[in-house]
Structure formats: C-alpha cells, structure tokens
C-alpha cells in the first residue's frame, strides 16, 4: 500500500537505453572487413597494412564481435557459457543476451587465464544434460587447457569455442592505449612473422571433434554439427585483432604510467590519468 501509485523517475529512459543497446549490438554483429580503409573498434593501433597482414596469414576476415554474436544467436538459449580473461569478458558483458537463468558464467574479478576450459568441465559435471561452451582466446587456451584432455578421457562432452587473433589482444590494447608500441603481445616469430597455429589439429590429436570456422556461415554450420556430437569439440575461429569492443564512455583502467618519458604517447597517457584520478571517488 505504501507504494500504491508509485511511478519510477526513469520514465522511458530504460526503454530508450535498451533500444540504443540493441542497435549497437546489431551494428557489431555485421562488421565487414575491407582492405582499403577498415576502421576497427580499437582505433589507431594497427595500420591497414598490419590488419591486411593478419587477414592474409590467418586466412580470415572475421571480426571478433561478429563471431561472438553469431554464437549467441545460434546456440540453444539454455546452453551454458563460461569465460574468464582477455577481451572476451568485456565483449560478453556489453553484448551477450541471456534468456535463461544460470546460463552465463563469467569470472571477472581476477581475469584467470585458463579458468575457461577447466571451468567448462565443472559446468558439465554439474549440468550433465546441457551443452556447455568455453569461450576462450588463444592466449588463455595456451596458458591452460589440460582439463580438455580430462573431459575427453572421461567422456564428459564440452565445447571449446576458441577465438584466435594470434596474440594477447587485450594486453596489447592496454599497452598501446598507454602510449607504448606493440611489445611482445603479438604472436610473432623472431623474424617478425605472424604465427598461425592449427588449434583444430591440436584438438584432433587429443581425440576431440574439431572444426575450422573463419566465416559466419562456417561458424553456424560448426555450431550446429558440434551439438550433435557425443564427444568434446573445439571450434577454431581465426578473428582479426582490434575487432573486440572498445571501452565506450567512462570506462578507464587505473594503471601505472611513468611521470617522466620522452615518448609523447606516454606523456599524454600520464596527463589523462591525472584527469581521471580527479574524477575518481575517494574511498
């Protein structure tokens, strides 16, 4: 009775924000790469020539957000996903649409690289009748995926969805945002050639059913076929670097920046940090 007749002050704001989010989600699901003037979500880091080099070596033009939203729209709503580290948790937080409770399992706080695959096995043990999916980058997969073999060994079917941009993409973004060059976060050889690791072949060697999906059509087909399997699967997606979501307005990481530097980018990063700290809450 105390709330009888109460109306929220939000009015139509929530509806407007949801419509704005859906429009942005739709845009990011349809990103198309081109070799002349491609404008990725993470801007001003890699030149067009470098992006073209990745497209050639990895044999792909698939943006990360397009791949992720294709997965969201293709797998069953009651499937369970898990993710932990890299740029993918941020993408999921901004873009993933969950329709069924307890189907979205994210480890945000500690960014535990390698938790994804082992956590997926745990999800399967707790939910044996459901399809479970590990959403993982190539960096985290290389860090730890030993429980993938355990899942195969004990016939506990899990699905690994591996986003391969040939590097530690999230940390590469971070170092370049703070005025540095690209420093040892790209997977390149000592003569600067991009690595193209065949993760599907690795998975096949373990005894899993493996797929290579570098287009939306290939990804949809792989997801549908993987669901039919009675053993663990891995879908390898080669995705272009710098095609994850950006931070949008207000998102900022408080990291150490040198107060003194002869690099203009570092100087600007330090000035930005001081501006942001003035706006931060004093706990």
Where are these regions (language model features)?
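Thiamine diphosphate
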Residues: 1-11, 69, 90-91, 95-283
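Secondary-structure junction/capping motif
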Residues: 9-16, 45-46, 53, 62-63, ...
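Generic structural signal of hydrophobic/aromatic residues within well-ordered alpha-helices
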Residues: 17, 21-25, 42, 46, ...
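A diffuse structural propensity rather than consistent per-protein peaks
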Residues: 18, 22-24, 28, 39, ...
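Short, isolated positions within intrinsically disordered regulatory regions of eukaryotic proteins
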Residues: 24-26, 42, 100, 256-257
């Amino acid at each position: 009775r105390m709330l009888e007749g109460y109306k929220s002050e939000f009015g139509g704001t929530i509806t407007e924000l949801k419509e704005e989010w859906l429009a942005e989600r739709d845009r990011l699901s349809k990103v198309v790469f081109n070799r002349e003037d491609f404008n990725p979500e993470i801007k001003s880091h890699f030149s067009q020539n470098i992006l073209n080099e990745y497209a050639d070596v990895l044999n792909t033009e698939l943006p990360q957000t397009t791949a992720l939203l294709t997965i969201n729209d293709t797998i069953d709503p009651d499937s369970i996903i898990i993710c932990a580290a890299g740029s993918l948790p941020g993408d999921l937080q901004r873009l993933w649409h969950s329709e069924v409770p307890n189907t979205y399992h994210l480890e945000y706080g500690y960014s535990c690289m390698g938790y994804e695959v082992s956590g997926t096995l745990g999800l399967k043990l707790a939910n044996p009748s459901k399809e479970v999916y590990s959403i993982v980058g190539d960096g985290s997969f290389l860090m730890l995926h030993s429980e993938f073999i355990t899942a195969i060994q004990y016939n506990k079917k899990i699905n690994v969805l591996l986003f391969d941009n040939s590097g530690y993409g999230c940390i590469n973004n971070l170092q370049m945002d703070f005025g540095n060059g690209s420093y040892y976060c790209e997977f390149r050889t000592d003569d600067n050639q991009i690595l193209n690791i065949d993760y599907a072949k690795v998975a096949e060697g373990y005894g899993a059913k493996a797929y290579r999906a570098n287009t939306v059509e290939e990804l949809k087909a792989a997801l549908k076929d993987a669901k039919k399997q009675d053993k663990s699967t891995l879908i390898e997606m080669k995705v272009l670097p710098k095609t994850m979501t950006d931070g949008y307005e207000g998102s900022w990481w408080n990291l150490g920046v040198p107060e003194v530097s002869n690099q203009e980018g570092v100087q600007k990063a330090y000035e930005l940090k001081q501006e942001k700290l003035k706006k931060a809450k004093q706990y």
